[in-house]
Amino acid sequence: MSSEKSTSIEKLTKYYSLQVVSQERLYNFLPKINILGSDKVCCDFIHSLIDQICGKIISFDRFINDENQRIIYQLIRVYTLFINKVVGKDLKKEFICEDLKTSNVDNIYITAISDCIISRFQDIKKELTEKLSTISSSSLSDFDWKMNAILSSDRINIVQENVLLLNLTIETNINDKKEQVLIELSKKELDHILETFDQINEVSF
């Protein structure tokens, strides 16, 4: 039996799959997967997520009821991030399990989640590679922006929030095609993007 183990992976955070400490708080939501009630339903949920990552149109209605709707939508976002991260870093099953264990996911779900990801690993990797290739062959050719003031209500008071609307013109190398992408950013989201750009700039120089 081979004693080979990938024990030399460097951890930049307490998780093998994360490189930015600020993202650790997102993984705090991973244990909420137990709301699904069984490892069988968990497997169905994870496979549905993987199908969606691979480009299929998936409905998650069968997992949702009036009581868990908010949690399920958050699980979709967090586990999509998790799957993309572990596959993007090409992590072995032991490290996927270790990350789930670190975030306090129950053992029965750790096995179910890791088995699902490993069984579809190459499908996910192929899809991520194709998406990366598409992004790499594209470039920003123009942009425009404007500020909008929107009103949001929480039934107690009404708050005016400034929102940045960023219109990007993306030029691809495929038939010189140009695409328009509209991004809506709150101040918090814009601050996060600018902070990320600062970090990238520091690494570059």
From Swiss-Prot:
Query: What residues does the COMM domain cover?
Result: 139-205
Give GO terms: molecular function aspect only: NF-kappaB binding
InterPro entries noted in UniProt: COMM, COMMD4/6/7/8, COMMD8_HN
Q: Name one Pfam family in it.
A: COMMD8_HN
Query: Which GO BP terms, alphabetically?
Result: signal transduction
The UniProt entry's sequence similarity note says: Belongs to the COMM domain-containing protein 8 family.
Read off the PANTHER family from this record: COMM DOMAIN-CONTAINING PROTEIN 4-8 FAMILY MEMBER, COMM DOMAIN-CONTAINING PROTEIN 8
What's the subunit arrangement here?
Component of the commander complex consisting of the CCC subcomplex and the retriever subcomplex. Component of the CCC subcomplex.
The task this protein performs is described as: Scaffold protein in the commander complex that is essential for endosomal recycling of transmembrane cargos; the commander complex is composed of the CCC subcomplex and the retriever subcomplex.
Q: Indicate what this protein is called per its UniProt record.
A: COMM domain-containing protein 8
Which lineage is the organism of this entry classified under, starting from the top rank? Eukaryota, Amoebozoa, Evosea, Eumycetozoa, Dictyostelia
What would be the name of the gene that encodes this protein? Answer: commd8
